[in-house]
Amino acid sequence: MKFIIKLFPEITIKSQTVRLRFIKILASNIRNVLKTLGDNIAVVRHWDNIEVRTKDENLGVQICDALTRIPGIHHILQVEEREFRDMHHIFEQAYEAYGELLHNKTFCVRVKRRGKHQFTSNEVERYVGGGLNQHIESAKVKLNHPDVTVNLEIDQDVLILVKARYEGIGGFPIGTQEDVLSLISGGFDSGVSSYMLMRRGCRVHYCFFNLGGSAHEIGVKQVAHYLWNRFGSSHKVRFVAVDFEPVVAEILEKVDDGQMGVVLKRMMVRAASKVAERYGVQAIVTGEALGQVSSQTLTNLRLIDNASDTLILRPLISHDKEHIIRLAREIGTEDFARTMPEFCGVISKSPTVKAVKAKIEAEEANFDFNILEKVVSEAQNVDIRQIAEQSSEQVVEIETVTAFAPTDVLLDIRSPDEQDDRPLQLNGVEIKSLPFYKLSSQFGDLPKEKTYLLYCERGVMSRLQALYLSEQGFDNVKVYRP
């Protein structure tokens, strides 16, 4: 089985040196992602594409799914290679491969050719298209927007039959740009902004300012791990959690009501800048959008920026909320954001939309900055791959089991799409489906006399959700790992 990976167009217009560097990094990223599927996958880079080959036909779906989520890839072609003698032989093989698909359909033939031949690409298109039209009476040629496009590639003496095409997410390969630190809250905005910087070639680390206890932190870890696992798993990244409750308490006590929002954001920027400097990160990423809330006016954003010399990137600055939610839906973070626990430590009755620098600095003069230094120095830094292990250490009473008792119910908390693609079947075991994003609201409705074994494929989501349910007072929860 072979896949041909086509590069994002912006990569192809780079200088030769830059283009080769980008292709080399992309090939390395692909290897890092696919090595989790097996050792028998070969990745070979060329000037204008990257080949992925495997002898295991069963890995095709998983390989394709992984490739569609790696930044830097424009599209993926699943192909079959054959030898050919002449144009008529090309037609015969195209008819064999595509004939059954063209009955009662409109079609066109598209050919790309490399090498020296006695025919042109257009001549092959006309010859193959004419032959298919003659041999399949119910098929009709339609050059614009046909039902089926017969894609052929000719590389020297090899005919490449394109069996399927899958769209990638585009962008630049992760690692071609410098690292950034995303201020993630688990909501719509921060998840989308993190994805946009990953797609632009940055390795994204995560910084979370905890205002609402462990339940909020668990939810945010789920979002960060999901984003990394889905789009950025080719690289190691950090998840930094800062306990910001002491800072909030100091603001509530020392800062005027109308200035609290801007002061809190300035404190977050200062703390994030210290974290970024500690790990050699060049910029901070936020999900702020112009005018969305009172602290996000131009005047207030300028004052927030002035709190630090670190570059602050705001990829969503001109996006409206509806567009942001649509993007969250496309990348799969919408359900996380909708069910994320909401915590607001600083609530101003009349927040300023046009803060004055002198007033802000006067309010901050009352703030004990030793508190800020302390919470930053005590920030928890964890490799995002170790989130599951960290959860296990935090809550030792969450039991992991491999067998079932008579009263046990296996609770499949994977998303509906994952359950449909890879249904769970176990003989003699009661299995219920309850996606992770519905657990917090619907778990309490389940029969209390049963013990529920939470299951997900990697064990990360199930452990985090079990931790959350345990903190909510449920003692009939375990984690199932086959």
Curated annotation (Swiss-Prot):
GO terms for biological process: thiamine biosynthetic process; thiamine diphosphate biosynthetic process; thiazole biosynthetic process; tRNA 4-thiouridine biosynthesis. This is tRNA sulfurtransferase. Its EC number is 2.8.1.4. Gene3D superfamilies: 3.30.2130.30, HUPs (3.40.50.620), Rhodanese-like domain (3.40.250.10). HAMAP family: ThiI (MF_00021). GO terms for cellular component: cytosol. The active site is at C456 (cysteine persulfide intermediate). It is an enzyme of class 2 (transferase). It is found in: Cytoplasm. ATP binds at L183, I184, K265, G287, Q296. Keywords: ATP-binding, Cytoplasm, Disulfide bond, Nucleotide-binding, Redox-active center, RNA-binding, Thiamine biosynthesis, Transferase, tRNA-binding. The keyword Glycoprotein does not apply. It catalyses: [ThiI sulfur-carrier protein]-S-sulfanyl-L-cysteine + a uridine in tRNA + 2 reduced [2Fe-2S]-[ferredoxin] + ATP + H(+) = [ThiI sulfur-carrier protein]-L-cysteine + a 4-thiouridine in tRNA + 2 oxidized [2Fe-2S]-[ferredoxin] + AMP + diphosphate; [ThiS sulfur-carrier protein]-C-terminal Gly-Gly-AMP + S-sulfanyl-L-cysteinyl-[cysteine desulfurase] + AH2 = [ThiS sulfur-carrier protein]-C-terminal-Gly-aminoethanethioate + L-cysteinyl-[cysteine desulfurase] + A + AMP + 2 H(+). Disulfide bonds join C344-C456. Residues 61-165 form the THUMP domain. Its main location: cytoplasm. It comes from Photorhabdus laumondii subsp. laumondii (strain DSM 15139 / CIP 105565 / TT01) (Photorhabdus luminescens subsp. laumondii). Residues 404-482 form the Rhodanese domain. Catalyzes the ATP-dependent transfer of a sulfur to tRNA to produce 4-thiouridine in position 8 of tRNAs, which functions as a near-UV photosensor. Also catalyzes the transfer of sulfur to the sulfur carrier protein ThiS, forming ThiS-thiocarboxylate. This is a step in the synthesis of thiazole, in the thiamine biosynthesis pathway. The sulfur is donated as persulfide by IscS. Pathway: Cofactor biosynthesis; thiamine diphosphate biosynthesis. Belongs to the ThiI family. One of its GO terms (molecular function) is CCA tRNA nucleotidyltransferase activity. InterPro entries: Rhodanese-like_dom, Rhodanese-like_dom_sf, Rossmann-like_a/b/a_fold, ThiI_AANH, ThiI_fer, ThiI_N, THII_Thiazole_biosynth_dom, THUMP_dom.
